[in-house]
Amino acid sequence: MLRPKKQSLKPKLKHRPFLKWAGGKFRLTDEINKAFPNKKNCLIEPFVGAGAVFLNSNFERYILADINPDLINLFNIVKXNVDGYIEDCKPIFFADDANTPDYYYAKRRQFNASTEPFERSIIFLYLNRFGFNGLCRYNSKNEFNVPFGAYKTHYFPEDELRYFAHKAQSAVFLCCDFQKTFEFADKDSVIYCDPPYAPLQQETNFTGYAGNEFGLAQQRALADLAKSIQKEKQISILISNHDTKFTREIYNGAKFKRVKVQRSISQNPEKRVKVKELIAIFGARK
């Protein structure tokens, strides 16, 4: 069992992630916290994303994973040296032509050509903040291919980076899949899963997962593993997803908590409507 440094943090205000993120759970952190069991000291997240739940929860230890190596590389760099990271980010963010298509696509080409972890981490943040709606998407060649966002104004998230680095001292960041992440669970853990959304309509059978498909078979595999590990370890496991006939079927046996969320990522602003989601809770709240 990994043992990151213990640290008790009690956030008084909600803390935004320093990354924009499709499907992020910032608006749902209060509801998710209410569903967590008491007297558990380690939160495990197999799909950490931008880390909204991590930043707004109060566990002594965190094991946070994602299959996106760029994301985990960034988190580990910010954790280890946030001052140096911020200093080296600013020349890119505050360049006179930073908010232009030519600059953006030049940086995207530089990112895709780079194999240097620190350089990639800096450009990854720039692409995230200046790209279209905070999407993180790769093509079949594993090249980042999100288009320019064309926003009027931009914000450099220095305060958010510093809070993340502070809280990250109690966390371990791992690049691995959900099956491997589940292996770290013990009796003192709770697992929260925020997988790519299952489709609202069955015929839409694909969700991007760091360049890989996370389709209905993977959704079912996650649900089956959650049931198995919950029974074996006698711990609570929570999964967020769309509230559909399919998700209710695969999460059969869980307690359901329904919520409505404003969908924030869409190319058509008229389609930004409230969507029904659920939190499936496996295991009694203790």
Swiss-Prot record:
It catalyses: a 2'-deoxyadenosine in DNA + S-adenosyl-L-methionine = an N(6)-methyl-2'-deoxyadenosine in DNA + S-adenosyl-L-homocysteine + H(+). It is an enzyme of class 2 (transferase). Its EC number is 2.1.1.72. May be involved in methyl-directed DNA mismatch repair, initiation of chromosome replication and gene expression. Keywords: DNA replication, DNA-binding, Methyltransferase, S-adenosyl-L-methionine, Transferase. Transmembrane segments: none annotated. This is DNA adenine methylase. One of its GO terms (molecular function) is S-adenosyl-L-methionine binding. PROSITE patterns: N6_MTASE (PS00092). InterPro entries: Ade_MeTrfase_dom_2 (IPR023095), DNA_methylase_N6_adenine_CS (IPR002052), M_m6A_EcoRV (IPR012263), MeTrfase_D12 (IPR012327), SAM-dependent_MTases_sf (IPR029063). One of its GO terms (biological process) is mismatch repair. S-adenosyl-L-methionine binds at residues 21, 25, 66, 194. It comes from the Bacteria. Belongs to the N(4)/N(6)-methyltransferase family.
